[in-house]
Design a protein with these regions (language model features):
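Helix-to-loop junctions at the C-terminal end of transmembrane segments
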Residues: 14-28, 116-117
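Intracellular juxtamembrane helix-capping segments at the cytosolic ends
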Residues: 71-85
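Multi-pass alpha-helical transporter architecture, strongest
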Residues: 132-161
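Loop-to-transmembrane helix entry
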Residues: 1-13, 56-57, 128-132
Length: 161
């Protein structure tokens, strides 16, 4: 059973190799959007999957880890590096790391705990609701990013916009 979890790492290795191709073909905005949409889909799959007939949804959700992580976090790091310029690269990466792995995770874990507590029922949890909450949130971020993200640069040091 635990071997199935390696699907996430395997897919991450594959999608990291696709990242440069995606930057050239669809640009940074749509690469990031693909990652955001994959997060939403992943949470939906976890919400509706189960250990019986819906196990394929859980396995697909695990396999989506690669596109989720690489097309969102890694692509964001590459974009930040390209936009920051030589003088501010280290500071920009430090700020991004603080925002995502520091404050972002701290706030995310607190919110996840509240959501899990909110959907507690008779010694268990309404897991579908627990998973659909972040799915909806990720989709809302996807829509906001689609509408609001604008980068005036045509190209950012080899990263197509």
């Amino acid at each position: 059973p635990t071997g199935k979890m390696t699907l996430g790492q395997i897919s991450e290795a594959g999608f990291i190799l696709l990242l440069p191709w995606c930057f050239r073909r669809i640009g940074i905005k749509f690469t990031l959007l693909a990652g955001m949409l994959a997060w939403s889909l992943r949470y939906v799959l976890f919400g509706f999957g189960d250990a019986g007939e819906g196990v394929w949804m859980l396995l697909l959700g695990i396999a989506l880890h690669g596109v989720c992580y690489d097309f969102f976090f890694v692509a964001g790091q590459v974009y930040t590096d390209a936009r920051a310029g030589e003088r501010f690269k280290a500071s920009a990466q430090g700020l991004l790391t603080l925002a995502t792995y520091g404050l972002g995770m701290l706030i995310g874990f607190a919110v996840a705990g509240e959501i899990t507590d909110r959907y507690a029922q008779a010694g268990s949890h309404a897991w579908q609701s627990v998973w659909l909450f972040p799915a909806g949130l990720a989709f809302a971020v996807f829509v906001l990013f689609l509408v609001l993200f604008r980068d005036p640069a045509e190209r950012t040091q080899g990263v197509r916009q």
